[in-house]
Amino acid sequence: MRDRKWSRRDVLKASAVSATGLLFAEPLRAAAPPPTAVTPDLIEAARKEGKVSFYSALELNTAERLARTFEAKYPGISVRVERSGAERIFQRIAQEQGSGINAVDVANSTDPSHYLEWKKSDWLQPYVPEEVAKYFPADQVDPDGTHATSCAWMEVIGYNTDLVKREDAPKSYADLLDARWQGKIVKAHPGYSGAILTATFVLARDLGWPYLEKLAQQKVMQVQSAADPPKKILLGERAIMADGNDYNLVLLKDQGKPVEVVYPAEGAPLIIVPSGIFRGAPNPNAARLFQSFFFSAETQQMLVDVFAHRSFHAQVREKGEHIPLANLKMLKADPAAVQAQSEEIKARYTKIFGV
């Protein structure tokens, strides 16, 4: 059981034995609960539980910073971080829930379609932090209150400025097909990374699978996480990255490293990262407190300033080095379509790239 990999089809089967106990039952939907403020009673109840488990697809240093900051703000409550790629987190939660194991309190994923699955399976507990209700746009909050967008970023092209002159650097996805870049490109994998799964869906939709077939002929170095391509071009193992997180490059540039961000002419995939509480959370009050902390202006500003993420919180200032989202051409995914096509995308990508 432990070694089994769960697909979205398995999740739907597992939902049949969820808390409802009704085969193929569709959970009843209700309006989102009223916004909840952080009160002394909530803090005290969370302290009595003493811990919270946070499953996260954010980079480990980001997830750990969130955990340690929360622990400093609320002494007596420890945070256990379980960090992995979004698709691995999805499989783990499916396995746990399908086995009747309630281990996760709060989960965030770089694949928004996961929340559609979890919501349909009735695994998410509606909870709306006060600041989400006040300061987040409606399109970044689930109407039923089961999740909201905790942060965002863009998947971009990038290059090592010691290896590629600015005037020669690719400006578009089409430019990556130039013969000069053969054997010089690195790319992340949609079978591991939820962000890259979303980006692959967008590129297949807008540029077509023939584009990806041509890109595969460029002798691309294949890595797992969307955070890996920036590391490879920094080390000079490859000159160009075909995808990867813009925030990694922004942070490296802040350190004076020889990398540059390219927002492709065709547009860059927007990656949103929802967060939600699980209905069977073993530490429900600590989960609520952590979720409210996650969406607070203070925490959101930290994610922007320290980790170069994007925030939809109305009171949070954009990082100075960032091109404002309003000035960028964004390629937005449809989570429901990603959900429906996920397994096909992974299989087709693996066949095309041979990995």
Locations of the language-model features?
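N-terminal secretory signal peptides
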Residues: M1-D10, A14-G21, A25
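Extracytoplasmic ligand-binding site segments that recognize negatively charged/polar headgroups
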Residues: S53-A67, V79-Q97, N102-P230, L234-E237
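A ligand-binding cleft/hinge motif common to bilobed small-molecule-binding domains
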Residues: S113-E117, A239-P258
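Short beta-strand->loop
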Residues: L124-A133, G145-A148, A174, L251-P269, ...
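Periplasmic-binding protein-like
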Residues: A152-W153, R180-G191, L212-A216, Q222-V223, Q255-A281, F293-E318, ...
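A bilobed periplasmic-binding-protein/Venus flytrap-type ligand-binding module shared by bacterial periplasmic
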Residues: G158-L163, F201, I271-N283, F294, ...
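Extracellular/periplasmic bilobal clamshell ligand-binding domains
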Residues: K319-V355
